[in-house]
C-alpha cells in the first residue's frame, strides 16, 4: 500500500506521466500487487459545489482505507488506484479503480 498526498488533486499532471511513474514503482517493488491510496487534503467539489469535509472525516476514511488494503488478499496480480476526497459529479468520497492494464508492462 502506497499513500500519496495529492494537494490540489494533482490536476496539472498528465495521465501518461502518472501511468509511467506508477509503472516504474510497480517494477521497482518486484511486480507485486499494489494499491495506491491518493488522499486530497484540499477542497472537494461534488457536481461543481464545494463540499465541506472536516479533517477528522478525511483522516478517518484514510485510516480505514489503509487498514482495509493492508488486510486485502488478491489471487492475481493487480494495481489499484484509490482516490479519497477528489472532485466528482456526485458525492463520492472514495473511488477505486483497477489500473493494472494501464500500468503493467
Task: Describe the predicted segments one by one.
Residues 19-33:
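Conserved short loop/helix modules at catalytic or binding sites
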Residues 1-20, 41-45:
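Short beta-strand-loop-alpha-helix junction that forms the active-site gateway
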Residues 16-19, 23, 56, 60:
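Short, well-ordered alpha-helical segments
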Residues 30-105:
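Basic, glycine-rich
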